[in-house]
Amino acid sequence: MIISAASDYRAAAQRTLPPFLFHYIDGGAYAEYTLRRNVEDLSQVALRQRVLKNMSDLSLETTLFNETLSMPVALAPVGLCGMYARRGEVQAAAAADAKGIPFTLSTVSVCPIEEVAPTIKRPMWFQLYVLRDRGFMRNALERAKAAGCSTLVFTVDMPTPGARYRDAHSGMSGPNAAMRRYWQAVMHPKWAWDVGLNGRPHDLGNISAYLGKPTGLEDYIGWLANNFDPSISWKDLEWIREFWDGPMVIKGILDPEDARDAVRFGADGIVVSNHGGRQLDGVLSSARALPAIADAVKGDIAILADSGIRNGLDVVRMIALGADTVLLGRAYLYALATAGKAGVANLLDLIEKEMKVAMTLTGAKSISEISGDSLVQELGKSLPAALAPMSKGDAA
């Protein structure tokens, strides 16, 4: 199969993975309206082509939280990453490390912090959820610090899990789920051999280490359902600073006022994100939400963005809309499922090449030169027409 884009990796991953795993990462909440709009809205952002600008000294390098990145991209936290390739977190981290960008380990990873961190030179980032079990949160923070993690990504848009209807149909949940997953694995021998047999243990490494016992997929589903804390507020986050003195990023911001609250709280960064369309269906796409948030807090806090980014052109679009750096989630997981570390490395190379083409043809020699001026402004609006808020007439 010819691989020339992330979309090729998606098709390959669908053939390789058992349906319960493919649809778990590919799907979204409810009718998946926001999932689709994440991609569609971003693809409609029109870039302003410029020519004869002498682009011979173009650079993608940028700095974030006193770290130098080879390009403004980091790998996002993805749960169960180790179910998509043998010890998947280790392989993805290695690809990111070789490229010179951060890897973010999920709370609900298969490989624990202590397994991943020693395999890479660059300090990795660690993602943590807001949970009822404060003892687990404290333990995870202490372990992340001991392992040399540099940045905490605190996910706040999951006070309760979203309703993902695909999971019940695919076998991730629903009637006879365990039996359905077993037969799906039998029908996908490449995955069954590489991950099902040779990728063990399939524990949730960070949770097992705290609970002192193995944890499987059923434990994962039950633990998540029982531990998210809907009572959390900004004030409750203050105690985290007692245990974490490094950069802290608040992930899951879609409203300018929440972005201002993050600044007041003293966060170092935010991630403009709707959790990849996996939480609340019908909310704004990240591309629609980003410009207003950038207007509110740009310069006061680092702005990261995810959801809908599929290629290097999308990275440039997000930066032009106001992001400093982007996070890749699904795109890298498709590549990981297809070809492990080599797949992720190739995807990152493709994104780098696509970014260079986009920057060359928009006249931006550096990341700092990508701005709203890189976008086509239509009818005097401050946003591209594709992202302008709908009028009442449009909504009808």
Curated annotation (Swiss-Prot):
InterPro entries per the record? Aldolase_TIM, Alpha-hydoxy_acid_DH_FMN, FMN-dep_DH, FMN_HAD, FMN_hydac_DH_AS, LldD
Per UniProt, subcellular location reads as:
Cell inner membrane
The main place the protein resides is membrane
Tell me what topology the record assigns in the membrane.
Answer: Peripheral membrane protein
Please state the Enzyme Commission number of this protein: 1.1.-.-
As its record notes, the protein acts as a catalyst of: (S)-lactate + A = pyruvate + AH2
Q: What class of enzyme is it?
A: oxidoreductase
* One Gene Ontology term from the biological process aspect of the record: aerobic respiration
> Keyword DNA repair, does the record have it?
no
Its cellular-component GO annotations read: plasma membrane
- PANTHER family cross-referenced by the UniProt entry: L-LACTATE DEHYDROGENASE (PTHR10578:SF85), S -2-HYDROXY-ACID OXIDASE-RELATED (PTHR10578)
What is the similarity comment for this entry? Belongs to the FMN-dependent alpha-hydroxy acid dehydrogenase family.
The task this protein performs is described as: Catalyzes the conversion of L-lactate to pyruvate. Is coupled to the respiratory chain.
- Full protein name: L-lactate dehydrogenase
